[in-house]
Each structure stands twice: as C-alpha cells, then as structure tokens.
UniProtKB/Swiss-Prot annotation:
GO terms for cellular component: mitochondrial inner membrane; mitochondrial small ribosomal subunit; ribosome. This is Small ribosomal subunit protein uS12m. Residues 37-57 are annotated as: Disordered. CDD domains: Ribosomal_S12. Keywords: Mitochondrion, Ribonucleoprotein, Ribosomal protein, Transit peptide. It comes from Bos taurus. It is found in: Mitochondrion.
Amino acid sequence: MSWSGLLRGLSMSLNYGLALAPRPWGTRPMATLNQLHRRGPPKFPPSKPGPTEGRPQLKGVVLRTFIRKPKKPNSANRKCCRVRLSTGREAVCFIPGEGHNLQEHHVVLVQGGRTQDLPGVKLKVVRGKYDCGHVQKKK
C-alpha cells in the first residue's frame, strides 16, 4: 500500500472521529461552502420566552402553598406555591427565606430565577412586596 493511501485513510478517520466528538452546549457543526450553497444560510428556531415572558417581574395571585422535596443529593422541605400570573399562566414559585405568611388569594410579586434542586420551579417570590412579608429577624 502506498503512503498516499495511508495518509488519506488517516485523514478520513481523523475527520470522522472529530465529527463524532462531543461539542459544548449551544454549538453546531460548521457547514462547508458547498452545503451553504446548496441549502442557503442556516435557519435557527426562534428562542422560547421564559416563564416571565421577557419581563423582570410579574404580579400574581397565590392559588395554594405546598412543600416540595429537592433532587437527590439534597434533603429538605422547600416551601413553594402555585401562582396565577397576571399574564394568565399558572406557575410554581419558590418562597425563599425562613418562614412565610402566604395563604390562598394573597397577591405576590414574582421574579425569574430557578431553584437548582427543584425540577420545574423557575420563579421566585419577592419577599417584602405586596402580601408577602419580609424574612423575620432571628431572636
């Protein structure tokens, strides 16, 4: 077998191996000029809005309060509430701090920011605004 055949096989295996290599999140493989010519410029899907739909905070009404258990390595009882937002959507919100006075029909201010160990909880209640009191000072 000739050297050129070996080199061609080596370069093809390297290219094939690089194509299968894991890529960091959010990156796409680059298109060749021929692919760009045939397909046109890449069309990316529009990004989905977050739970607050691009707003920093939203007002909402508490539907019910409950306790959730966090994911595997952590153990606690995380206080959460189901809130009907001013946009009409319902969402689960985390209540930060120790102790709270929230009950059904209380009006709260909600901001984005997920709770890492609670799956599906992407909003937090703002303490000290509307019907949600400040965190009490320890005695």
